[in-house]
């Protein structure tokens, strides 16, 4: 297949921009010895006459980092050809006007508005910028390997050029063309095209050679290529007999969608297959010539295409490694404010023989492919910038660390990381240790140095002396897939080890989260302990039934086979399915008792995740005026606060319940709820939260039945409708969640300051002493109501706060435990079976 030609498949280049007759670009590149590629960009621009203020972006400045070494602009006008030459390494500006007549004068035809960004060494200001600007600036005069390619006649600078000062070019009102930076592009603006017939621009730029750690290939980014030009691309490479070192066009697939990658591959394949080569025997350089890219080819840039030239250098990695590497990461929690931990990374490298290493591109292998005696053995790793800058990080005396790529390289798609190459001197069998340390706050990410080569034989992550409880989160990696918990030999540590020892493709990060708790146990912990790290309760209403899913994450030091917890079956439900650590093999881990209760058994690993699903079918009971759904929120007999996430997947259901008064210190505020009195320090643990039908503005009187000098504020109609439709009332007596459905009780004035709302219990159940706990919780709302009234009078803006996220996390208060079995019998006797069919209920009434 031959590459598509612009004449057969695409319009002429002039149609890409109606303001120009022709836009063409010749881009020729070559490699140097220090991970730098050199490009010469030759632009030919022919504008359309009788137009003014035409802007043309011709060089994209970001996100690719490069250095502009020189710029030459040649203007063809009615007054004759004129040339401007700007060169970085000599800090010199040269100009010639009307070359044919030998006349030299100030270049008033050319104006530059971006000297500070392009050539800071030529800037008229005394103060230099502290940080590099959009374009990466680095001096090339001291580096002989970064010298520009052989100059053409266009690049040659006459000896008698007029040496102009920078201010001569800046903001000239009489200029015909102007050079600017606009929206991260180098832009050429034609102020008047009546006298300009043609413009030639030659740019010399240096671009770093980067490395893709997904394909382990080196590449030269081509994001700087402009979009409206017909581009002819060529590149010089050292002649090689190995097909693996051939150049080919590719793209940054890490930021491309899978569906789009296929279409891009179909476009690039003809260009790679139809590439032509020419060999220069004198220099042993082979030049690759790709077919011209039409202007429409750059349309892929808008779809996140990152065009690159890839090549595979020979012996990029050692073929046979005789080194072993072990990595031990420890996180020690510190008693600081805010809470933080010290993360230390200990790397132990043992080299048995350095002569078995093949070399990296910076060195030259001998005839037998082994290292020379003066070569150094190396391994590569990705280092976070915070570690490099940390004063507590150090490396052994027999090692030095160097950057194989520029510090601002995009190899890992993040400026937070740097690719490091660690070199060791030639030694016999020996071991060396690397230690890096950093302080991170709890809940923030800690970045572990990623070892690209050699693959670690042992990778362990340990949290020492955690508070009770403490959780570990590893993003972008399934912990059951790549990392597994380690059997605890100590009672005051949580350990994980990496399942495989292959090279990691992405920088490894983890989060250490301190879960909220009421009481910190003394350390070290007891020999046997169990805690629920997290619990997720999801209610999914369906057609005539409910699906209730409960997910529990346990951390336990119990022996495998030990009973962890008994979970009561939800009322009128059947167990649908169960999973242990994501697998349906639950034999010996989930036991269903004859009374349909569930017993969870300790698995082989200290961290276990149990997923349970029940299906509840609707039943009916005419004697009661509301129905109750009892759901399981298990809790252990410990003074530990278990975080429970409640997720009700419906837009017609509303929540009313508890929120922890100290929730700002422990977790985010309950979301999708209007939180009342969240800042009141002297309010009890019971805080009312509900979701109104419509957003209520700040200061609206929404507190119901407030006693104020014999005056009562009634609840808004939206709040009444909310209660009549659906309520979720959370009471953590026995850690049980009650859903109250279709409440039909009246709204009356508070009687004797003893009730917040009229008791919703049927008269036949009022004498049931076993329900006093639930009724007492309802009556406690009146006390909260009074506290809220005080705050409403003083600080109304502190009482009402609206948040708008779709999930909620409720932290239960620790109360006296009651018997699950007793509650089950009492509620069955009081309310009968579950009734959820509203339509039938309305007809019955």
UniProtKB/Swiss-Prot annotation:
Subcellular location: Membrane
Transmembrane residue ranges: 726-746
Example of a GO cellular component annotation carried by this entry: membrane
Domain of life where this protein originates: Eukaryota
GO biological process: meiotic cell cycle
Cysteines joined through disulfide linkages: none
Low complexity: bias regions: 132-145
Keywords from the UniProt entry: Meiosis, Membrane, Transmembrane, Transmembrane helix
Disordered, as annotated region: 122-158
Membrane topology qualifier: Single-pass membrane protein
Chain's role: Has a role in meiosis.
Protein name in the entry: Meiotically up-regulated gene 4 protein
């Amino acid at each position: 297949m031959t590459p598509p030609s612009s004449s057969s498949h695409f319009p002429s280049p002039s149609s890409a921009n109606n303001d120009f007759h022709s836009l063409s670009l010749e881009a020729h590149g070559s490699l140097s010895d220090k991970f730098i590629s050199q490009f010469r960009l030759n632009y030919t621009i022919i504008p359309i006459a009788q137009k003014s203020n035409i802007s043309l972006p011709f060089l994209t400045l970001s996100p690719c980092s490069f250095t502009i070494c020189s710029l030459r602009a040649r203007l063809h006008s009615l007054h004759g050809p004129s040339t401007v030459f700007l060169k970085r390494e000599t800090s010199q500006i040269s100009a010639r006007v009307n070359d044919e007549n030998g006349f030299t004068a100030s270049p008033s035809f050319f104006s530059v508005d971006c000297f500070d960004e392009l050539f800071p060494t030529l800037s008229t200001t005394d103060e230099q910028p502290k940080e590099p600007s959009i374009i990466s600036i680095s001096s090339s005069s001291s580096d002989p390997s970064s010298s520009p390619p052989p100059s053409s006649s266009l690049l040659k600078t006459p000896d008698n050029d007029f040496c102009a000062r920078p201010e001569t070019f800046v903001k000239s009102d009489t200029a015909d063309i102007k050079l600017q930076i606009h929206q991260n592009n180098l832009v050429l603006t034609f102020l008047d095209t009546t006298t300009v017939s043609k413009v030639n621009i030659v740019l010399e730029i240096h671009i770093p050679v980067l490395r893709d750690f997904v394909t382990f290939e080196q590449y030269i980014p081509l994001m700087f290529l402009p979009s409206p030009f017909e581009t002819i691309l060529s590149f010089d490479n050292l002649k090689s007999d190995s097909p693996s070192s051939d150049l080919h066009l590719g793209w940054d697939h890490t930021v491309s969608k899978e569906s789009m990658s296929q279409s891009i591959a179909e476009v690039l394949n003809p260009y790679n297959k139809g590439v032509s080569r020419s060999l220069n025997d004198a220099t042993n350089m082979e030049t690759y010539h790709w077919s011209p890219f039409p202007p429409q080819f750059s349309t892929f840039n808008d779809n996140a295409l990152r065009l690159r030239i890839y090549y595979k250098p020979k012996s990029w990695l050692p073929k046979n490694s005789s080194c072993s590497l072990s990595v031990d990461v420890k996180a020690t929690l510190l008693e600081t404010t805010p809470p933080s931990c010290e993360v230390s990374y200990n790397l132990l490298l043992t080299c048995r023989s350095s002569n078995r290493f093949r070399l990296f591109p910076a060195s030259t292998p001998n005839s037998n492919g082994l290292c020379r005696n003066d070569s150094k053995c190396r391994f590569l790793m990705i280092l976070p910038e915070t570690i490099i800058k940390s004063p507590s990080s150090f490396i052994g005396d027999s090692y030095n660390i160097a950057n194989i790529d520029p510090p601002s390289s995009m190899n890992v798609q993040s400026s937070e990381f740097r690719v490091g190459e660690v070199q060791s001197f030639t030694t016999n069998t020996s071991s060396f240790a690397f230690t890096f340390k950093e302080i991170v706050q709890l809940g923030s990410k800690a970045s572990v140095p990623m070892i690209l080569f050699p693959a670690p034989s042992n990778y362990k992550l340990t949290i020492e002396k955690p508070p009770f409880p403490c959780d570990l989160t590893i993003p972008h990696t399934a912990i059951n897939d790549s990392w597994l918990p380690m059997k605890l030999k100590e009672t005051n540590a949580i350990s994980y080890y990496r399942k495989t020892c292959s090279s990691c493709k992405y920088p490894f990060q983890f989060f250490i989260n301190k879960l909220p708790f009421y009481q910190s146990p003394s350390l070290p912990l007891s020999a046997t302990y169990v805690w629920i790290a997290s619990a997720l309760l999801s209610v999914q209403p369906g057609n005539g039934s409910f699906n209730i899913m409960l997910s529990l994450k346990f951390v336990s030091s119990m022996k495998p086979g030990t009973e962890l917890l008994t979970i009561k079956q939800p009322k009128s439900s059947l167990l649908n399915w169960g999973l242990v650590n994501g697998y349906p093999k639950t034999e010996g881990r989930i036991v269903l008792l004859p009374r349909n209760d569930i017993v969870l058994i300790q698995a082989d690993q200290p961290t276990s995740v149990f997923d349970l699903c029940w299906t509840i079918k609707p039943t009916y009971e005419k004697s009661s005026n509301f129905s109750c759904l009892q759901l399981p929120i298990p809790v252990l007999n410990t003074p530990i606060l278990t975080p429970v996430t409640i997720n009700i997947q419906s837009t017609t259901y509303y929540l009313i319940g508890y929120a922890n008064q100290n929730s700002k210190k422990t977790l985010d505020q309950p979301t999708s709820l209007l939180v009342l009195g969240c800042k009141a320090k002297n309010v009890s643990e019971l805080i009312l939260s509900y979701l109104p039908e419509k957003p209520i503005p700040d200061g609206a009187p929404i507190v119901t039945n407030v006693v104020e000098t014999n005056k009562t504020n009634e609840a808004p109609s939206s709040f009444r409708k909310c209660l009549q439709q659906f309520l979720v009332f959370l009471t953590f007596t026995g850690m049980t969640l009650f859903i109250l459905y279709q409440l039909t009780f009246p709204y009356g004035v508070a009687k004797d300051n003893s009730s917040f709302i009229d008791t919703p219990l049927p008269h036949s159940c009022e004498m049931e002493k076993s329900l006093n706990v639930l009724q007492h919780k309802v009556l406690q709302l009146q006390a909260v109501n009074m506290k809220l009234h005080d705050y409403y009078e003083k600080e109304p803006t502190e009482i009402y706060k609206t948040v708008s996220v779709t999930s909620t996390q409720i932290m239960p208060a620790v109360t006296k435990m009651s018997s699950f079995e007793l509650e089950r019998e009492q509620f069955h006797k009081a309310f009968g079976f579950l009734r959820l069919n509203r339509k039938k209920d309305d007809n019955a009434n």
